[in-house]
Structure formats: structure tokens, C-alpha cells
């Protein structure tokens, strides 16, 4: 490919709405263009990277016996209603109606479609296990698309699904996917973590995420340096000590707290620590309102709440709903005298004489006590774990980091097969629901995550495995006939040997060519410039300042050997050392 023909419109300036390095460089490098919020067009360079990522993923899927299919993006609501997720999935689901007023969704995932497919095709345990996968677009109506490809409304995913006659068979396939995903990460060359994760709206009883550490990552990871425990903060369980206060219970009383709503304001106004205040949060779900109680110095973990109550439709009630149904502004909600289901974090159980909302504007109760003053229906671990909390395995203080989720695998069990009446006949002639697993990999997100991982102040540093092109040949003076001739010859020789090479034959300055080469991130650059008078060309790795001089007076043999050696030694991680 000649640079003058390559559709790669680079930008000198950073677009104003850019928030991350990957978003900036992919836009400036001419890999993507924004169509609308969270929706992107992939230009030729970006498409080449995507295809290479897809190829790696496909090879690893095929290696473990998965078979590729392609399912429809447009999905009928009936299937989602069968599974119970039409209402549970939440506002991220893009819903639409056809001209006959029938409901559809642009698929955020494909559990329903694939379960419906298989239940009409597989009848016997002899046909199991079956593993299928696809690489396709997915759609989620993100409330705030951000970070470029990392949180988009349209994105490319590989999603795989497995069907089994036994839990042992599912366990075996689950481990195969763990190994396959680890190999994908290793082929990308990135550091990664495999962490325990919450199943969320997908469901199931076990889940792991494959995460690339990154400061801008949206997955909060807790890990133990002693025993190796790793989990998302949504999943990590608190197994430490709880406060068990021994003081005598005092009579509760209502006190005026004018304009005092937040935990911090209440703490300062009443002169009590946040740990002596109980937050009362109202949620709405399938069964109506639920009041959630947690100690004031802790954060509620919504993922745990939804998992414990088995209701993914749960959401925090709006101030308008609370005012309409309870007659109280947000900030003064409390558990005393309120006839709704109450669930509480274990941190509340051992408290004495604490503060709660007074269920009346500008009012709180002090010296509230459980169970004297109100009843809790169910107790759970509902806190969000943070750095310094004890490891649930060995008790050592946990460390925290952030990461970008690329892969997520689930043991679904019979969640979908039972709901959608998908059965097979076992070896005893009995009808049993399929035992299922599902396995997602963010293909377009991988491109951004790799850039976040490998870059410098000049641009992207692609690993060889997914670089759009391996080599760029820069003719530094297009007015020099010898440079043009030699540059063209090197380009021709490399192309004939199957090398993915770009010839920069533009009528621009050497500095301009170097900046574009660094921004785009070509792994290896060959300079054909003034040193050609001595019969020398220069080779340079993207992340290195060293120029390797190669004499080509007697042909290109040494050049080709040097290039192969540089490719063998090429390691983007060197840039961080």
C-alpha cells in the first residue's frame, strides 16, 4: 500500500470531546471517525486492526472446537419475554417497533436467540456438548457513551454459547474458554488479570472477567498480594469483623435538621460520625419498593443487591416517585414507621443509638435501634469492598486497581433453558433442561485497550500481532531519484515476500512522515534518506530511539535478515521500561 493512496486522514489537533489516549490517537491516526455519540466508522487502518483481532479470536475459538455461526441483530421481543429479560435488562436495551407495532430489540446479547435455535434442533444427550460462536455488532443504549470505543452504543463482540448434558461437561468447557482467553491476551502481548465477577443481567452462578489494567478502566479490581485472590468490587465479599456496640439503648427522638440531607451534612450538623448514621435508600423492582439500609460510611453495591434479591430490574427510585408515594423529599427517608420491605447490610446489625431519616422534611431520628424501632426483613452483604478491606480468603488487606474488561465468561446453568423450555433427552430417557455457558469478548474494545496499554507521547505502539501494517518505508526526499528508486525497490521486495508494508511516497517533509509513522504506530520504520549516498538505509523500532544502519550496496539480504531479527525481538512492553 502506498501512503499517498491510503485513506488514513491524520489530524494534527486533538478533537475537543476526547477523554482518553486511545480515543485521541485512534481519531488522530485516521483509524476511526465519529458518526454520532458512541457510534463510529472504522477507516481502513482501523478495519485492518479489527480483522486481525477477530482472526486471533477465531483461531482460539476454533482451536477449542467452537463452531462459527451468525445470528440476527434484530430480535423479536417474544423471546426476551420468555426469558424474563424484556423488562429486567434495563434502559440500555434498544427497543423498537416495526410497521405492525410488533416489539423488537437491537441485540445487546444473544442468549435468547441461540437457546431458541438449539431447542428446536438438539434432542438427545448424544448431540452434546455443542459450542457455537459469532463475531457481530451489538447495541446498548448507554446513558453516556464515553471513552471512544471503550463505552460505545454500537460495538463488535465475539459471543459464544455452550450447551451441555452435565455440570461436569460445562466445567470442562468453561476451563477451555479460560485457557483460550488467556492465549488471546498473550498473543496481544498485554498484561492481564483473571478476576471473579458478578453475573449481572446475563445471570448464572459463576463468572470471570479478563481485565487489562488501565487507569481509565471502569472495572474496579481488588486483589490480594499474599494469596492471589482477584475479584471485581461488585463481586468481592466482605468476610471481616462487624461492629458490635455494647452501649445501652437510648430512647429515640425526632430532631429538626433543616436543609440537612447528605451523610456529610447530617454528620456535621448532629456531631456524629458517618458510621453512626444509617443510610435508607429506596429502590423499585418487580415487586414494588424495597428500602435498603447500610451504614453511612459505606457504599451500597447495587450488583450484590440485585443478585441477592434476584431482580435485575431494581433501580433507585426517583425523587419525584419518592415525594409522590411517601410525601418526603430525598434525604429524609428512614425505616421507622414505613410499611415497605426492608433489607439491610450486616453492618447495621451491630449498631446502637444511630441516626436515620425522620420520614418528614427537615427531620431525623436520633438513638434509633434495631429491632426495637423497626424490623429488617432480610440481611445480606451489600457493601462495596474497597482497598484495605480484608481479603475474603486469607484476611490480608486488599489492594485496588482499575482495568478494562475485554473478556467475560459465565456459567449460566439452566436459567435460559428452563425459562424457554429448551430440553433434551438424557441417557435414561428423561427430559432435562440444557446446562449452558456463555462467553463474550469485546473485539472493538480490544483495539482501544491495546492503545491504552501501548502508547507514548507521539502515538500508538502496536504489537506485531494486530498492527495494521508491519513496516513503513519512508522515502525522505521525493526529489532524489536514487532515494525514490531504492525505496520503491525495497517496497517491491518486501511486498513480494508477503510483508505487510506501506511506502510513504508523499511529497511532504521527513519530519511530517516521521510524525505520521509514530502516530499510526507502524512497528518498524525503514528510512531511505541521505545516508543512501554511503549505501546505507536505517531501520528503527517504533518504541526505540536507536537507528540500525544496514548496508545495501550488495543487495537486500542483510536488510531482510535485520528486519526479521527486529521482528523477533520486537516487544512493545519495552516502551514502558
UniProtKB/Swiss-Prot annotation:
Its EC number is 6.1.1.15. SUPFAM superfamilies: Class II aaRS ABD-related, Class II aaRS and biotin synthetases, YbaK/ProRS associated domain. GO terms for molecular function: aminoacyl-tRNA deacylase activity; ATP binding; proline-tRNA ligase activity. It catalyses: tRNA(Pro) + L-proline + ATP = L-prolyl-tRNA(Pro) + AMP + diphosphate. Keywords: Aminoacyl-tRNA synthetase, ATP-binding, Cytoplasm, Ligase, Nucleotide-binding, Protein biosynthesis. The keyword Aminoacyl-tRNA synthetase applies. It is an enzyme of class 6 (ligase). It holds the Pfam family HGTP_anticodon. InterPro entries: aa-tRNA-synt_IIb, aa-tRNA-synth_II, aa-tRNA-synth_II/BPL/LPL, Anticodon-bd, Anticodon-bd_dom_sf, Pro-tRNA-ligase_IIa, Pro-tRNA-synth_IIa_bac-type, Pro-tRNA-Synthase_IIa_type1. GO terms for cellular component: cytosol. It is found in: Cytoplasm. Its main location: cytoplasm. GO terms for biological process: prolyl-tRNA aminoacylation. It comes from the Bacteria. NCBIfam families: PRK09194.1, proS_fam_II. Catalyzes the attachment of proline to tRNA(Pro) in a two-step reaction: proline is first activated by ATP to form Pro-AMP and then transferred to the acceptor end of tRNA(Pro). As ProRS can inadvertently accommodate and process non-cognate amino acids such as alanine and cysteine, to avoid such errors it has two additional distinct editing activities against alanine. One activity is designated as 'pretransfer' editing and involves the tRNA(Pro)-independent hydrolysis of activated Ala-AMP. Homodimer. Consists of three domains: the N-terminal catalytic domain, the editing domain and the C-terminal anticodon-binding domain. This is Proline--tRNA ligase. It comes from Thermotoga sp. (strain RQ2).
Amino acid at each position: 500500500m502506498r501512503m499517498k493512496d491510503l485513506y488514513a486522514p491524520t489530524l494534527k489537533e486533538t478533537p475537543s470531546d476526547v477523554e482518553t489516549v486511545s480515543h485521541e490517537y485512534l481519531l488522530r491516526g485516521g483509524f476511526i471517525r465519529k458518526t454520532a455519540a458512541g457510534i463510529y466508522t472504522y477507516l481502513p487502518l482501523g478495519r485492518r486492526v479489527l480483522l486481525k483481532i477477530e482472526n486471533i479470536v477465531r483461531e482460539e475459538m476454533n482451536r477449542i472446537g467452537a463452531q462459527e455461526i451468525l445470528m440476527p441483530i434484530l430480535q423479536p421481543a417474544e423471546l426476551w419475554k420468555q426469558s424474563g429479560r424484556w423488562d429486567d435488562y434495563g434502559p440500555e436495551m434498544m427497543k423498537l417497533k416495526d410497521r405492525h407495532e410488533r416489539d423488537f430489540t437491537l441485540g445487546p446479547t444473544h442468549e435468547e436467540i441461540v437457546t431458541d435455535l438449539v431447542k428446536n434442533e438438539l434432542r438427545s444427550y448424544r448431540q452434546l456438548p455443542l459450542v457455537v460462536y459469532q463475531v457481530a455488532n451489538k447495541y446498548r443504549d448507554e446513558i453516556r457513551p464515553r471513552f471512544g470505543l471503550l463505552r460505545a452504543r454500537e460495538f463488535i463482540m465475539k459471543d459464544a454459547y455452550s450447551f451441555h448434558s452435565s455440570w461436569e461437561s460445562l466445567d470442562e468447557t468453561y476451563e477451555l474458554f479460560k485457557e483460550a482467553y488467556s492465549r488471546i491476551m498473550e498473543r496481544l502481548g498485554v498484561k492481564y488479570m483473571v478476576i471473579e465477577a458478578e453475573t449481572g443481567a446475563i445471570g448464572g452462578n459463576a463468572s470471570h472477567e479478563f481485565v487489562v489494567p488501565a487507569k481509565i478502566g471502569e472495572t474496579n479490581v481488588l486483589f490480594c498480594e499474599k494469596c492471589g485472590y482477584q475479584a471485581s468490587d461488585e463481586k468481592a465479599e466482605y468476610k471481616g469483623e462487624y461492629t458490635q456496640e455494647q452501649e445501652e439503648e437510648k430512647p429515640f427522638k425526632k430532631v429538626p435538621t433543616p436543609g440537612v440531607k447528605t451523610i456529610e451534612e447530617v454528620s456535621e450538623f448532629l456531631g456524629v460520625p458517618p458510621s453512626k448514621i444509617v443510610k435508607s435508600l429506596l429502590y423499585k423492582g418487580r415487586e414494588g419498593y424495597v428500602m435498603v439500609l447500610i451504614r453511612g460510611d459505606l457504599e451500597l453495591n447495587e450488583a450484590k443487591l440485585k443478585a441477592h434479591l434476584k431482580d435485575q430490574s431494581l433501580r433507585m427510585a426517583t425523587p419525584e416517585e419518592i415525594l409522590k408515594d411517601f410525601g418526603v423529599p430525598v434525604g429524609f427517608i428512614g425505616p421507622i414507621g414505613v410499611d415497605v420491605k426492608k433489607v439491610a447490610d450486616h453492618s447495621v446489625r451491630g449498631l446502637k443509638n444511630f441516626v436515620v431519616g425522620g420520614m418528614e422534611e427537615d427531620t431525623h431520628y436520633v438513638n434509633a435501634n434495631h429491632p426495637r424501632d423497626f424490623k429488617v426483613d432480610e440481611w445480606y452483604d451489600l457493601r462495596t469492598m474497597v482497598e484495605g478491606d480484608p481479603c475474603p480468603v486469607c484476611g490480608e488487606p486488599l489492594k485496588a486497581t482499575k482495568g478494562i474488561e475485554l473478556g467475560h465468561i459465565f456459567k449460566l446453568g439452566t436459567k435460559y433453558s428452563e425459562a424457554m423450555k429448551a430440553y433434551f433427552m438424557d441417557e435414561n430417557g428423561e427430559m432435562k433442561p440444557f446446562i449452558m455457558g456463555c462467553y463474550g469478548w469485546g473485539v472493538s474494545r480490544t483495539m482501544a485497550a491495546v492503545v491504552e496499554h501501548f502508547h507514548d507521547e507521539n502515538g500508538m505502539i502496536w504489537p506485531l500481532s494486530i498492527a495494521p501494517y508491519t513496516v513503513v518505508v519512508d522515502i525522505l526526499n521525493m526529489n532524489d531519484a536514487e532515494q525514490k528508486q531504492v525505496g520503491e525497490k525495497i517496497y517491491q521486495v518486501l511486498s513480494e515476500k508477503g510483508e505487510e508494508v506501506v511506502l510513504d511516497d508523499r511529497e511532504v517533509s521527513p519530519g511530517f512522515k516521521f510524525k505520521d509513522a509514530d502516530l499510526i504506530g507502524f512497528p518498524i520504520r525503514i528510512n531511505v534518506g541521505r545516508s543512501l549516498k554511503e549505501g546505507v538505509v536505517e531501520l528503527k523500532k517504533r518504541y526505540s530511539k536507536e537507528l540500525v544502519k544496514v548496508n545495501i550496496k550488495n543487495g537486500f539480504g542483510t536488510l531482510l535478515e535485520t528486519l526479521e531479527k527486529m521482528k523477533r525481538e520486537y516487544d512493545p512492553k519495552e516502551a514502558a521500561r
